[in-house]
């Protein structure tokens, strides 16, 4: 696995540290973001491979933040994984609309986090290979 970066966006310092520990032990580089209002700029400047974010945060909820990330050309392809202790069926359409690819229910197991991140990176890499392959066919 090449070195991949995960941006973790959460207003809870304990959650940030726990997720940092899980992902660092799995070989990922992490960017910890507790500044919810500045999170979009941090994502734009760092372009992580995956974003892992809490949905319930003060000032800006995760849906609004995901939507803001997806409206920026440079970051709209970054997979977003939402975390929350509360998920309802009516959230599914909102998650799709905001570009959230996957969700993890809190409390989570470390393997749930690693599995979700690895699957998003794998799906993103597969999409890039298919896009590159299609481009090569067009050029031929």
Name what the model sees in each region.
Residues 16, 58:
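The feature encodes the CheY-like receiver
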Residues 17-25:
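Charged docking surfaces used in two-component/phosphorelay signaling
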Residues 32-50:
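Acidic, metal-coordinating helix/loop segments flanking the phosphotransfer/catalytic sites
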Residues 34-38, 61-67:
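Acidic catalytic/metal-coordinating carboxylates
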Residues 54:
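Active-site residues of response regulator receiver
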Residues 64, 86-105, 111, 115-119:
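Alpha4 helix (beta4-alpha4-beta5 surface) of REC/receiver domains from two-component response regulators
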Residues 123-140:
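CheY-like receiver
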């Amino acid at each position: 696995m090449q070195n991949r970066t995960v941006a973790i966006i959460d207003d809870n310092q304990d959650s940030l540290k726990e997720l940092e520990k899980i992902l660092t032990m799995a070989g990922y580089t992490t960017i910890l973001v507790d500044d919810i209002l500045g999170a979009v700029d941090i994502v734009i400047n760092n372009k992580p491979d995956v974003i892992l974010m809490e949905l319930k945060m003060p000032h800006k909820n995760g849906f609004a933040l995901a939507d803001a990330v997806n409206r920026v050309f440079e970051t709209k392809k970054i997979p977003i994984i939402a975390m929350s202790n509360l998920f309802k069926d009516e959230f599914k359409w909102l998650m799709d609309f905001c570009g959230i690819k996957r969700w993890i229910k809190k409390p989570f197991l470390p393997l749930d986090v690693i599995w979700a991140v690895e699957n998003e990176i794998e799906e993103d890499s597969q999409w890039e290979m298919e896009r590159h392959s299609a481009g090569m066919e067009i050029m031929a």
